[in-house]
């Protein structure tokens, strides 16, 4: 039985996703920059192509002001070089005027023929620090405007930050039906949980102990239930999977064998989410870990020494990692966003050892969002005015 009621209660599969390192986050040794792994379009798109080839169903494309790829530009560039994998594009609310963002999303959704999902983020913009309550209020309004653009004939919004009346939604109609692209969201503060509970579809969590994850799920469900809604749940976690546990643990140690902790701190501080509540929870997990960095069997926190955000990895044999993922599924987790270093190599390890043993799905298809043929939208097969 799941920890809390979930939207896709009858779904017997999981959306298994990989990660494209758009934000200067690919290493052979954590904290040791390698020019061959820089976040160029060529390298990041190679990760996308490898993930699609291996059978991953979605790929997270993050957003940060770092040397690398602009998220939406990158996703657009990948549209013609992919045909099966979905894209989970991060959108930092407030970067773009909301109605123009809705139009941009609609363009991408048509380019990808419904293979678009969105990761709603609310972190600071480069060079400025905004009050958390304001950032989440802004995100709440942006998401509300997006949802109107995708489901109504006009946008009518009278908020504290944005005001629009009677704006036609024709230019912003997405390829996907029944609500538009799915919204994935992660956050731990009361304002974050309220936004997710009221507006989003999938609540994303970073790796902690199973008891802590269950508490996160209960907190998110409480806010969703207050709005008469349910959520699906996702876990973002790194991977180190090998034929044996010993090999996996040795490789985990190898990853951090050249790490200078001061430089690791510098890397963490570069990220826009470095001061967030979620990041503090990841730091706490490192403090509670044993002398080898494990906070729970096979859950290793060493990644977080040189990375903000998601700071732990499942480390183990094929069977151990598969069993851990199955336990998460029993809790009610329906989406896994995975990564590993270097991203091409670890995708191959997971994609050949574990992924073939999992029943996977595309959540937009499971939700009935993706039409079987080009929809009657203004940008699709609808009447042109």
Swiss-Prot record:
- Asked if the Swiss-Prot or TrEMBL record annotates the protein with the keyword Flavoprotein, the reply is yes
Please tell me whether the keyword Transmembrane helix is annotated for this protein. Answer: no
Catalytic activity, as annotated: 6-sulfo-D-quinovose + FMNH2 + O2 = 6-dehydro-D-glucose + FMN + sulfite + H2O + 2 H(+)
List the EC numbers from the record: 1.14.14.181
Write down a Pfam family by its short name: Bac_luciferase
On subunit structure and binding partners, the annotation says: Homodimer.
The family annotation for this protein states: Belongs to the SsuD family.
This chain's function reads: Part of the sulfoquinovose monooxygenase (sulfo-SMO) pathway, a D-sulfoquinovose degradation pathway that enables the complete utilization of all carbons within sulfoquinovose (SQ) with concomitant production of inorganic sulfite. Catalyzes the oxidative desulfurization of sulfoquinovose to sulfite and 6-dehydro-D-glucose. Is highly specific for sulfoquinovose and cannot use sulfoquinovosyl glycerol. FMNH(2) is provided by the FMN reductase SmoA.
- Indicate what this protein is called per its UniProt record: Sulfoquinovose monooxygenase
């Amino acid at each position: 039985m799941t920890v809390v009621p979930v939207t896709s209660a009858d779904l017997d599969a999981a959306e298994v996703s990989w990660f494209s390192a758009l934000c200067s986050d690919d290493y052979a040794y954590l904290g040791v920059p390698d020019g061959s792994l820089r976040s160029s379009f060529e390298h990041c798109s190679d990760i996308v192509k490898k993930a699609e080839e291996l059978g991953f169903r979605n790929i997270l494309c993050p957003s940060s002001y770092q040397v690398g790829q602009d998220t939406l530009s990158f996703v657009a560039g990948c549209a013609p070089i992919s045909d099966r994998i979905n894209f989970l594009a991060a959108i930092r609310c407030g970067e773009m005027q909301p109605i123009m963002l809705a139009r941009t999303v609609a363009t991408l959704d048509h380019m990808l023929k419904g293979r678009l999902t969105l990761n709603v983020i609310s972190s600071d913009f480069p060079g400025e620090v905004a009050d958390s309550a304001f950032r989440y209020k802004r995100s709440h309004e942006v998401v509300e405007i997006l949802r109107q653009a995708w489901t109504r004939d006009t946008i009518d919004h009278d908020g504290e930050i944005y005001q629009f009346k009677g704006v036609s939604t024709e230019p912003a109609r997405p390829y996907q039906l029944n609500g538009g692209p799915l919204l994935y969201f992660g956050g731990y503060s009361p304002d974050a949980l309220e936004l997710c509970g009221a507006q989003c579809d999938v609540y994303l969590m970073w790796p902690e102990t199973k008891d802590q994850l269950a508490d996160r799920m209960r907190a998110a469900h409480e806010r969703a239930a207050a709005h008469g809604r349910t959520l699906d749940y996702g876990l973002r976690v790194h991977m180190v999977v090998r034929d044996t546990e010993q090999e996996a643990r040795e490789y985990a140690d190898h990853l951090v064998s050249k790490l200078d902790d001061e430089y690791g701190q510098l890397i963490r501080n570069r990220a826009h989410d470095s001061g967030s509540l979620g990041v503090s929870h990841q730091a706490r997990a490192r403090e509670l870990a044993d002398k080898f960095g494990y906070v729970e069997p096979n859950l290793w926190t060493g990644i977080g020494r040189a990375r903000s955000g998601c700071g732990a990895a499942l480390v183990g044999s094929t069977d151990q990692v598969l069993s851990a993922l199955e336990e998460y599924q029993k809790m009610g987790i329906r989406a896994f966003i995975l990564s590993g270093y270097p991203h091409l190599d670890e995708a191959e390890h997971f994609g050949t050892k574990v992924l073939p043993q999992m029943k996977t799905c595309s959540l937009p298809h499971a939700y009935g969002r993706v039409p079987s043929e080009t929809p009657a939208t203004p940008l699709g097969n609808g009447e042109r005015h």
